[in-house]
Amino acid sequence: MPKMKTRKAVASKFRVTATGKLKASRPGRRHKLTGKTPKRKRQLRRPGLVDDGHLKTYKRLMCL
């Protein structure tokens, strides 16, 4: 059976932590920023962890 190819689009959006979880940048920080509070924009800078419901799918696409 051949090797699975990594989905490069998925691999470019996520980073793997030391414990095997996935980190990704948060959505909502590209445009329409005038309606958001400074606190909300500041918190959107930090990357978030992928929830358990999607973790298995993304890991399979990244061949982990």
From Swiss-Prot:
Keyword Metal-binding listed: no
Spans annotated as Disordered: 19-44
BP terms from Gene Ontology: translation
Keywords from the named record: Ribonucleoprotein, Ribosomal protein
Signal sequence residues: none
Cellular-component GO terms for this entry: cytosolic large ribosomal subunit
Gene: rpmI
NCBIfam families per the UniProt record, alphabetical: rpmI_bact
Basic residues composition-biased segments: 23-44
GO molecular function: structural constituent of ribosome
Family: Belongs to the bacterial ribosomal protein bL35 family.
This protein's name: Large ribosomal subunit protein bL35
HAMAP family: Ribosomal_bL35
